[in-house]
Amino acid sequence: MSFAPPPDYSKIYLALGCGLGLGFVVYASRVNHLPHVGDNTHNLPHGGQYCDGNKRVLYSGPKSGSSPTNNLWPFITVIALTLAILLTSCPRRRVCIRCSQHH
């Protein structure tokens, strides 16, 4: 019969979680979400133009309508509607004027 304490794996899980978190942060900071514009030799992700003897590329860049702040309105609307439904569907127990009890 062994009186040794069971092995503590919490430090392994902590190191694994930190490594995965750091890997996700590095991946998220390096990934390119801009649309691919151009061909295999000419890349214009921020807008611009290119012209040579047999091809012409004109790209004006990402529009202001595609900003991440415009994507927040549906989320805010869903949260507001959910709160409104929850607040209106709560049973309100009113106090009786005559006996001061909830009915």
UniProtKB/Swiss-Prot annotation:
Residues 1-8, 92-103 are cytoplasmic. The chain crosses the membrane at residues 9-29, 71-91. Keywords: Host endoplasmic reticulum, Host membrane, Membrane, Transmembrane, Transmembrane helix, Transport, Viral movement protein. GO terms for biological process: transport of virus in host, cell to cell. Residues 30-70 are lumenal. InterPro entries: Plant_vir_prot (IPR001896). Signal peptide: none annotated. It holds the Pfam family Plant_vir_prot. GO terms for cellular component: host cell endoplasmic reticulum membrane; membrane. It is found in: Host endoplasmic reticulum membrane. TGBp1, TGBp2 and TGBp3 seem to act together for cell-to-cell propagation. TGBp1 is the main movement protein that physically cross the plasmodesma with the viral genome. TGBp2 and TGBp3 would facilitate TGBp1 function. Plays a role in viral cell-to-cell propagation, by facilitating genome transport to neighboring plant cells through plasmosdesmata,. Belongs to the Tymovirales TGBp2 protein family. This is Movement protein TGB2.
